[in-house]
């Protein structure tokens, strides 16, 4: 165990990662050294920032807590604290089941944790978080919470009502990060497309995106977690006309059959979904759409699932993720539906869906062979420089693999023009041409 060292372990989504980065800056401001590598935890203080979204994430969080409890018993770490979504949702249960943890805190309890340790909380440090990502890119969380009421989702229970961050705060944070070398920003929120309604009485996502794109030094802005119902169409001209706003949109659609959309309480129809996608692709030529779909929601029939498969074949999403339904306590589903789809059926449908998407992804990538694309280099690994295009977000999307060439050294964080020379379903191969 190392004195004056804090280890922060982050589980779950990029929004959780931002929370950890804010907390890490508070520890640094109080004179601690801070580490974010779960493989080398040995601190005087360990904080596990948990995820509580669905069953698999909850299990991973509990297992991580138990691993840290064993490390504490063995003397490899000192105090152990747990916070985040799982702790926000199940704090009393966790206290009973795992009492070895020194204290449990909710998702937004940074001040309480710092106060418990007898340290000072520096409000001015909230916009100076300690990045855990490579310096050239960062996640920018523009709001907290969610006002939607999707049947399956526990996020509003955990995070509360939607709360936009003031636009000036976001602009200032991006300016500060640019000064320190950040060039690429992923805009994230539980619901990106609700931004501004609470603060300004109107949707202001388009204005925010435009203002951020005006900041000198911002190379790429990428939009994540849009909601299809009441989509702000004034965003589309901003995406089309501004070169540093990536032609990329992450919009979770979940399903397409009208019976399922109603049961999911998505507030959009099949016809409206097709119309929205056509409008987006018409107004922003070349845009790459990422979506997330679900299999096995209560009541999903074979006919519903076949509609979903046909939807994927029709739209041919450039990027797609999928997961199986998880029955979560406190949700509308929990109160009104039975979890009536066997797990084996959920998994079978998931596999079939992803097999269809793999063929589509392969075709999209093969069509890029011979094209020239701007690439940012993230790292060097196993004989390749590994980078991404504007159509690829970190961690979740394909990568561009550029073989080492004698006399050619590519720098992480730098942008290059590359010619695509080969393709796999989820990765590209390329060579530098500038």
Curated annotation (Swiss-Prot):
One of its GO terms (cellular component) is cytosol. Its EC number is 2.8.4.4. Residues 132-363 form the Radical SAM core domain. [4Fe-4S] cluster 2 binds at residues 146, 150, 153. Disulfide bonds: none annotated. It catalyses: L-aspartate(89)-[ribosomal protein uS12]-hydrogen + (sulfur carrier)-SH + AH2 + 2 S-adenosyl-L-methionine = 3-methylsulfanyl-L-aspartate(89)-[ribosomal protein uS12]-hydrogen + (sulfur carrier)-H + 5'-deoxyadenosine + L-methionine + A + S-adenosyl-L-homocysteine + 2 H(+). Catalyzes the methylthiolation of an aspartic acid residue of ribosomal protein uS12. This is Ribosomal protein uS12 methylthiotransferase RimO. It comes from Porphyromonas gingivalis (strain ATCC 33277 / DSM 20709 / CIP 103683 / JCM 12257 / NCTC 11834 / 2561). The gene is rimO.
């Amino acid at each position: 165990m190392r004195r004056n060292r804090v280890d922060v372990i982050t589980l779950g989504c990029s929004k959780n990662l931002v929370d950890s980065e804010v907390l890490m800056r508070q520890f640094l401001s109080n004179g601690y050294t801070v580490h974010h590598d779960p493989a080398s935890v040995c601190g005087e203080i360990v904080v596990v920032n948990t995820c509580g979204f669905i069953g698999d994430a909850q299990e991973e969080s509990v297992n991580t807590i138990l691993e840290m409890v064993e490390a504490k018993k063995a003397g490899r770490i000192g105090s152990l604290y747990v916070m985040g979504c799982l702790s926000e949702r199940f704090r009393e249960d966790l206290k009973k089941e795992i009492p070895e943890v020194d204290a449990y805190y909710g998702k937004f309890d940074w001040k309480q944790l710092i106060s418990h340790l007898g340290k000072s909380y520096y409000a001015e440090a909230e916009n100076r978080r300690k990045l855990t990502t490579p310096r050239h890119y960062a996640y920018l969380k523009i709001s907290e919470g969610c006002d939607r009421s999707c049947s399956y989702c526990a996020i509003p229970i955990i995070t509360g009502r939607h709360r936009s961050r003031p636009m000036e705060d976001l602009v200032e944070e991006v300016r500060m990060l640019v000064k320190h070398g950040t060039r690429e920003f992923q805009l994230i929120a539980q619901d990106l497309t609700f931004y501004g309604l609470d603060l300004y009485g109107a949707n202001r996502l388009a204005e925010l995106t435009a203002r951020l794109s005006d900041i000198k030094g911002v190379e790429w802005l990428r939009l994540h977690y849009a909601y299809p119902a009441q989509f702000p169409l004034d965003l589309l001209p901003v995406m089309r006309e501004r070169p540093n706003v990536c032609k990329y949109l992450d919009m979770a659609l979940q399903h397409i059959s009208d019976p399922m959309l109603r049961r999911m309480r998505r507030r959009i129809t099949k016809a409206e979904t097709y119309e929205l996608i056509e409008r987006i692709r018409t107004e922003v030529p070349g845009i790459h759409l990422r979506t997330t779909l679900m299999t096995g929601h209560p009541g999903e029939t074979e006919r519903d699932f076949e509609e979903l498969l046909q939807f994927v074949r029709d739209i041919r999403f450039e990027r797609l993720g999928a997961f199986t339904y998880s029955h979560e306590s406190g949700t509308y589903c929990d109160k009104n539906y039975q979890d009536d789809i066997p797990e084996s059926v959920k998994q079978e449908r998931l596999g079939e869906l992803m097999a269809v998407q793999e063929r589509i992804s392969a075709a999209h990538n093969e069509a890029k062979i011979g094209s020239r694309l701007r690439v940012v280099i993230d790292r060097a690994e196993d004989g390749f420089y590994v980078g991404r295009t504007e159509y690829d977000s970190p961690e979740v999307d394909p990568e561009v693999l550029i073989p080492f060439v004698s006399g050619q050294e590519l720098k992480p964080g730098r942008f290059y023009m590359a010619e695509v020379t080969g393709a796999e379903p989820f990765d590209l191969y390329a060579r530098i041409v500038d």
